[in-house]
Every structure is written in C-alpha cells, then in structure tokens.
Amino acid sequence: MQYLLIVKKALGMLEKLRQAAREMRVAVVKMTTAAGSGHPGGSLGIADVFAALYLGGVLKFKPGDARWKGRDYFVLSNGHLNPAWYAALAQAKCIPERELTTLRQLGSRLQGHPVRGTLPQVEVSTGSLGQGIGVAVGIALGMKMERLPNRVYCSMGDGELEEGSCWEAFAAASHYKLDNLTIFIDRNGLQQNGRTEGIMTLEPLAERLSSFGLNVINADGHDFTQILAAFKKARATKGKPSAIIFKTTMGKGVSFMQAKHEWHGKALSQTQAAEALKELAQ
C-alpha cells in the first residue's frame, strides 16, 4: 500500500509539471505576441526545465519573500529566455499571472532581459551572453566563504558557450570546488543565425566541460523524470560544480516552430499565435 501511495504521488507530480509547462508555453506565446517582440523559440524549449526547477521541489524559495535569506539563487545567464522565466514565476505564485501581459512595456517590471531593481527575484541584470555565469560563480563562492547552505543555479544557452568568459567562469568554479553550483545548459543546437555547430563547434561538449573539472550530467530536457533526476544528482555531487546538458527542442509544442532557428528572436503574428495556441491546447 505504501509503495502504491508513493507511485501515485510521483505520477501526480509529473502530471502537475506537464500541466504547468503547457500553461507556461501558452503564456510565452501570448506575451511575446502581445509585445510584438521577444524570444519565443528558446522559451518554449526550456519550459519543462523551468517548470521542474520551480515546481518540482528543486529550487528553494518563498513566493511571498523573494529576498528570503535561505533561498537558493537563480541566475538567468541566457537572459533572452525571460518569457519562460516570467511564466515560471507566475506558475510558482511569485508574480501575478495578469502581469505577464505587460512584457516589454515601458515601465513594466517584466523587461525583455532581467533588470535588477525591477522584479525582486532578479539577482543580477543579464542578457549580454557569458556574463551571468561569472556572477553565479561569484555568488556560489561567497556562499562557500560564509559557510552558508544556499545553492546557486545558473541557466545558460548552448550558443552562449561561444563566449570565452563562460569557460573562465567554469575554470574558476572548478578551482574553488563549488559543489553548491549547478549550471544547466539549454542544448537545442540552434542560435540566432543557424546551427551552433555551423557557427562555432561545441562538441564534444560533455568532454570539454569535464576537462574543465565539472561534473557533467546528460538529460532529456523534455522528460520530467530525467530532469528531476539530473538536478538530484547534481545536488548530491561533492567537491566539484555540476553542469547539466539538457537536450531540448527550440519551439517545443508548436509544430511550425520546432527546431527552427528563425524563431530564436521573432514574435508570432496574430494568425500564427492562434494556430500555436490551438496546438498547445491539444
């Protein structure tokens, strides 16, 4: 009986995450279409990972107290995926869902990239690729020096890894044995102008990260069981930082957007949005 209850609870969690990710994708389409700009492709692709991070018991936070001292720190180094992050914050009751409609509006707290001083959940302004990871390493080092239990999570894009500053940060994280740092990479193989491998070769990515002293974990970024297991494994790792490579699909959930780099930073038309929302409702 106890086993059946555990299984039922686990299945309930997975369904909760699937529903949340679906609603996040709907929000991404609606808010970027209303704004007429933004980055819907990658946001649709990372939705499952963000849902697991915020609703799967991975990230420690208090919805009503964004500056809680016991919180885990989250840095969105690939800051253009803000639509997905805002949608996750709404699902986690950190911000009102109605506020999502203000994306990129003058005076809105929800700017196109994270801006410190707008939302209290923004730990650092990001968007210039390759910079957020350095700050995340600094926060993790500070936690270590103060002997604090807080963990640091840093979201990165695979195209972002073309920036040399990322690798300097990885080297420092390894040098200081920052096992309180979990880096996760959105490996969709695409960036603004095409395929990552055609612009700057990243493979063998796992081996490269490992050579910098990181504990590398590979996972399907659309399989919640794998996503949660990867975060759990990273948390259990001692003596070195972890890097999770999440294999994802840009534009996930919308057939005409999937695996197409053209949707990196282009909003949908009203007609396209209606079709996308129809697919996401199925």
Question: Model features per residue range: what roles?
Answer:
Residues 87, 115, 165-167, 193-197, ...:
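Short acidic, glycine/serine/threonine-rich loops at helix termini
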Residues 28-31, 43-175:
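Cofactor-binding active-site loop characterized by glycine-rich and histidine/acidic residues
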